[in-house]
Amino acid sequence: MSLEDSLRSLSLDYLNLLINGQAFSDVTFSVEGRLVHAHRCILAARSLFFRKFFCGGSDPSASSGLIDQTGVRVNPSGSPRSSNGVLVIPVNSVGYEVFLLLLQFLYSGQVSIVPQKHEARPNCGERGCWHTHCSSAVDLALDTLAAARYFGVEQLALLTQKQLASMVEKASIEDVMKVLLASRKQDMQQLWTTCSHLVAKSGLPPEVLAKHLPIEIVAKIEELRLKSSIARRSMMPHHHHHHHPHDLNAAADLEDQKIRRMRRALDSSDVELVKLMVMGEGLNLDEALALHYAVENCSREVAKALLELGAADVNYPAGPAGKTPLHIAAEMVSPDMVAVLLDHHADPNVRTVDNVTPLDILRTLTSDFLFKGAIPGLTHIEPNKLRLCLELVQSAALVLSREEGNANNNPPSSTTTTLPMYHHPMNDDHNSSSSSGNNHNIGNLNLDSRLVYLNLGATVGSGQMSDDHGGRHGDPAMYHHSHHDY
């Protein structure tokens, strides 16, 4: 047996004492109404905080005591005792799960800060989540970090910081901002640097950041963006290196002003002004995340008009997660936005950094409805809209797959014509014969989509999925080419 194995074995011996509960226990903590049995000698040996606490001294400043959320100090000599005479000490400063993690580390020097995979967590609505970088995992790590700092267990604090630094690389921007705030509050410079750069790269404008972060942090993020912009310009092979720094500052401010003007124009449905900015001022719609903004904040008509300018990439990935406008429309459960994006050749199979497609998002939301019903966080979603979104994206993926298969089997000739392949079923103006032809080519919904269709309890009404001229119900899997504008 190696030295490392021997040390690990000794650590597990201590951990077994904690797991076995009352065996040789001489102190009991009450956390969230649950009793945790422990051993004063081990806690005092591993933690200066507990050593001072158990010593108890007459001077409150000399003995930290256990402090609850109201700031009341608990004196061990005055604490109640259990039936067998063991001290029962109330702990209100941390939760039960975090307190157990803290004790596990004190007993063994080892701990896993990631929640159990696939278990239901309060801040994670995704079934089957591995909890590696979701909101629940980030919250647990932040709580553990706060507890480690509170109880003075610096080794655990360092371990948790490394864990968080790994998590934020794949976490949502909202969670990154939470970690950013914690790193500033607890003066963790390395974690601050990592998170601030991720927020700076997110593309979120200052007015959005200001809703989540203090104004001084927003100012630092903008300063980082400015430095990054200057660095990029200095690497460009042109002759403008002699420009004064304040000229570069002015250029960066000008870009920010352009983006703000563009968003105001989109908010007021003035796409013509956006067009003038593209043609006359060189506005880059992709870098300004114009389409992402329009999908999330504007009407379908504005998004459609923006796409028809031909200056925006419908599949442009944004932020650390690499979400496209179609990902955002899927998360919003907006059939209108999904339809207009697919009509302009949005890729239904495009993946984020985490390999998530728009179809994955809709399937996850659908399974949540089927297995959980309306749950907190999903109450704003209408089942009919969710069904339509799922059908649109599934059928678009099916058409794309078949076209790719046909292209591989039959190399295109010089006379081949490419047509738009997606069409919103609610706006179909073709006659019955056209629909029948397309139905023969595309086929029916697959079994998965039919199950979703039935389970959500939605029926296709004549006002939703019918042919306007022929008067018959349209196949929900049909996405015809339309010769008219929406």
From Swiss-Prot:
Induction: Accumulates in the floral abscission zone (AZ) upon senescence onset (i.e. at the base of pedicel following flower removal). A zinc finger (C2HC NPR-type) spans 121-135. GO terms for biological process: floral organ abscission; induced systemic resistance, jasmonic acid mediated signaling pathway; nodulation; regulation of DNA-templated transcription. GO terms for cellular component: cytoplasm; nucleus; plasma membrane. InterPro entries: Ankyrin_rpt, Ankyrin_rpt-contain_sf, BTB/POZ_dom, NPR5/6, NPR_central_dom, SKP1/BTB/POZ_sf. Zn(2+) binds at residues 124, 129, 131, 134. Residues 466-475 have a biased composition (Basic and acidic residues). It comes from the Eukaryota. Expressed in xylem vessels and parenchyma cells of pedicel vascular tissue in the abscission zone (AZ). Accumulates in developing root nodules and present in roots, especially in the upper part. Residues 406-418, 432-442 have a biased composition (Low complexity). Pathway: Protein modification; protein ubiquitination. Coiled coil: none annotated. The BTB/POZ domain mediates the interaction with some component of ubiquitin ligase complexes. Belongs to the plant 'ANKYRIN-BTB/POZ' family. 'NOOT-BOP-COCH-like' (NBCL) subfamily. This is BTB/POZ domain and ankyrin repeat-containing protein BOP. It comes from Lupinus luteus.
